[in-house]
């Protein structure tokens, strides 16, 4: 399954919402990073004050190279979010994103996007 992603910025909430699916190749990851950077330029909050909601329920298991590339993206201090909520469905995908997001304030949610969004915006489940 080829990769697909959608990234939307909500400047009023200081929120970046990311939906990802499929299997990511190197070119897909570069396109994702460019789109993420463009979405960040729409935010009005201060640096590193935004929130990020990521839905990877439809994402396939990724190669080790892809996991490493996503880790580099997540480790970029210029785009580091205050909090990240990640909605996952597969155990292995969850383990992969945990490796990629090891240095971040992340909460993981199984299948429930609304619970994840509530935690992100209100700080509680």
Where are these regions (language model features)?
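Amphipathic, Lys/Arg-enriched alpha-helical "gate/interface" segment within cytosolic domains
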Residues: 1-125
């Amino acid at each position: 399954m080829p990769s697909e992603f959608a990234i939307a910025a909500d400047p009023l909430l200081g929120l970046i919402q990311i939906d990802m699916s499929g299997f990511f190749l190197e070119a897909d990851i570069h396109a994702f990073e460019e789109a993420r950077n463009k979405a960040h330029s729409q935010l009005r909050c201060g640096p590193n004050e935004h929130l990020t909601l990521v839905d990877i329920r439809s994402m396939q298991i990724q190669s080790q190279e892809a996991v490493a590339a996503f880790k580099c993206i997540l480790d970029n201090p210029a785009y580091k979010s205050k909090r990240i909520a990640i909605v996952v469905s597969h155990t292995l995908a969850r383990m992969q994103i945990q490796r990629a997001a090891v240095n971040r304030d992340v909460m993981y949610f199984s299948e429930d996007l609304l619970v994840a969004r509530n935690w992100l915006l209100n700080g509680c489940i």
